[in-house]
C-alpha cells in the first residue's frame, strides 16, 4: 500500500507543496529504479497492492501473484491523480499494445480503457483481473497456492538473470492521444 492519503491531505491543507513534490519525486525515482535496474526485479504479490504498492508492482521486471490479489490505483477515489509512475506506465503499455495492433498509430483505443481504470479507481479482485486490467502482463505468473509465492518469485528472478536479463530501453517518447484525446477524456469524466 502506498502513501498515507490522510497525511497527503493534511500537507496540502497546510500548503506544504514543496514537501509533497519532493516526496513524489523520490517515489518516482524508486519506481524507475525498479524498472531499469540492471538485475531482474520480481514483485511477489499477495493480498493488497494499492496506490503506490500497485505502482511498484507495475514497474517490476516480472510479477508472481497469488490468485487472491487485490491491485489498483485507488488515488482517484479520494480526488488525487496517481503520481508514482502508474499513469506513465499505463501510457507506455497502451503505446506498446497499439504498436502490436493492426493500427499502430492509433493509441487512443488502448488509452481509453486504462484511463477509465485510473479515473474510476478500479481495483482488480483477483490476479486474473490484475492482468485483464493491465496492471500485470499476460506473461506474468499466477499461483493458486500462495504458499509457493516466494519460492516461485525467487525462481523467476534467477531464471531471468540466467537468461542474461537486461532492463528495457528507457522510453524517450510515448505517443498519446493529443488535444482530441484530452477533450474526449474530459467529456468522459463529465458524463
Regions of interest found by a model, annotated:
Residues 1-26, 79:
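Glycine- (often His-adjacent) and acidic-residue-rich active-site loop
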Residues 61-83, 134-149:
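Gly/Pro- and small hydrophobic-enriched strand-loop and loop-to-helix capping segments
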Amino acid at each position: 500500500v502506498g502513501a498515507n492519503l490522510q497525511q497527503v491531505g493534511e500537507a496540502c491543507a497546510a500548503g506544504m507543496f514543496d514537501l509533497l513534490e519532493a516526496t513524489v519525486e523520490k517515489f518516482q525515482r524508486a519506481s524507475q529504479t525498479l524498472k531499469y535496474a540492471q538485475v531482474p526485479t520480481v514483485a511477489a504479490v499477495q493480498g493488497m497492492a494499492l496506490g503506490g504498492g500497485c505502482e511498484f508492482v507495475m514497474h517490476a521486471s516480472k510479477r508472481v501473484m497469488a490468485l487472491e490479489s487485490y491491485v489498483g490505483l485507488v488515488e482517484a477515489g479520494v480526488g488525487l491523480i496517481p503520481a508514482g509512475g502508474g499513469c506513465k506506465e499505463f501510457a507506455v503499455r497502451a503505446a506498446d499494445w497499439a504498436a502490436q495492433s493492426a493500427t499502430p498509430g492509433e493509441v487512443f483505443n488502448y488509452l481509453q480503457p486504462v484511463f477509465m481504470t485510473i479515473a474510476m479507481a478500479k481495483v482488480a479482485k483477483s490476479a486474473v483481473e490484475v492482468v485483464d486490467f493491465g496492471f500485470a502482463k499476460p506473461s506474468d505468473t499466477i499461483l493458486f497456492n500462495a504458499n509457493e509465492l516466494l519460492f516461485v518469485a525467487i525462481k523467476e528472478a534467477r531464471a531471468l538473470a540466467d537468461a542474461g536479463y537486461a532492463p528495457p530501453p528507457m522510453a524517450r517518447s510515448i505517443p498519446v492521444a493529443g488535444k482530441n484525446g484530452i477533450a474526449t477524456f474530459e467529456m468522459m469524466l463529465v458524463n
